[in-house]
Amino acid sequence: MLKLTPRQAEILAFIKRCLEDNGYPPTRAEIAQELGFKSPNAAEEHLKALARKGAIEMTPGASRGIRIPGFEPGAANEDEGLPVIGRVAAGAPILAQQHVEESCQINPAFFHPKADYLLRVRGMSMKDIGIFDGDLLAVHTTREARNGQIVVARLDDEVTVKRFKREGNKVWLIAENPEFAPIEVDLEQQDLVIEGLSVGVIRR
């Protein structure tokens, strides 16, 4: 398989996640919504590029006609463990290869919902709920979050772990340490992306 761009790798990871979680691949519209494309046509162009590189196979005329050669949901991830993500570069996808420090041999299904990666925690802003500097945070990738959940959020290209609270167009990213003030986000003026939910912590 030819080398993928960061965006192509992100799409491939989303397809695998849908196969793992649902048993079937996403539609073009679902890919466009997940990745923030303006239309399914943009997703189609990326899928064609992935097919040219041998990463996927496409069935013409089928909305979910995407398969990954040799990919068996559940089998590969359990053998390979979970990628450990270190410092995330501004603007780059979290699962971009340059962020992967190592692999941790733990079954993703140990967590619920299933973990997609482990994020190395930086700092002590969440210490009051037992998340410390250097811990590995198990993260389930999703763009949705409910009030009170612990999220991995990307704000103006910086990735942070905080408790999520939303009221209308305002979001607060709240630390679990009184030394850190809540981060107030105006969704009409700032770019906030939910990268995933905390589903567990590993201390080494």
UniProtKB/Swiss-Prot annotation:
Annotated keywords: Autocatalytic cleavage, DNA damage, DNA repair, DNA replication, DNA-binding, Hydrolase, Repressor, SOS response, Transcription, Transcription regulation
One GO term of the biological process aspect: DNA repair
Site (Cleavage): 90-91
Documented EC number(s): 3.4.21.88
Signal peptide annotation: none
MF terms in GO: DNA binding; serine-type endopeptidase activity
Active site, UniProt feature: 125 (for autocatalytic cleavage activity), 162 (for autocatalytic cleavage activity)
DNA-binding region: 28-48
Gene3D superfamilies reported for this sequence: Umud Fragment, subunit A (2.10.109.10), Winged helix-like DNA-binding domain superfamily/Winged helix DNA-binding domain (1.10.10.10)
SUPFAM superfamilies in the cross-refs: LexA/Signal peptidase, Winged helix' DNA-binding domain
InterPro entries: LexA, LexA-like, LexA/Signal_pep-like_sf, LexA_DNA-bd_dom, LexA_repressor, Peptidase_S24_LexA, Peptidase_S24_S26A/B/C, WH-like_DNA-bd_sf
Superkingdom as given in the UniProt entry: Bacteria
Reactions it catalyzes: Hydrolysis of Ala-|-Gly bond in repressor LexA
Family that this chain belongs to: Belongs to the peptidase S24 family.
Subunit structure: Homodimer.
HAMAP family: LexA (MF_00015)
PANTHER family to which the protein is assigned, alphabetical: LEXA REPRESSOR, LEXA REPRESSOR-RELATED
Known function: Represses a number of genes involved in the response to DNA damage (SOS response), including recA and lexA. In the presence of single-stranded DNA, RecA interacts with LexA causing an autocatalytic cleavage which disrupts the DNA-binding part of LexA, leading to derepression of the SOS regulon and eventually DNA repair.
Protein name: LexA repressor
Species per Swiss-Prot/TrEMBL record: Ectopseudomonas mendocina (strain ymp)
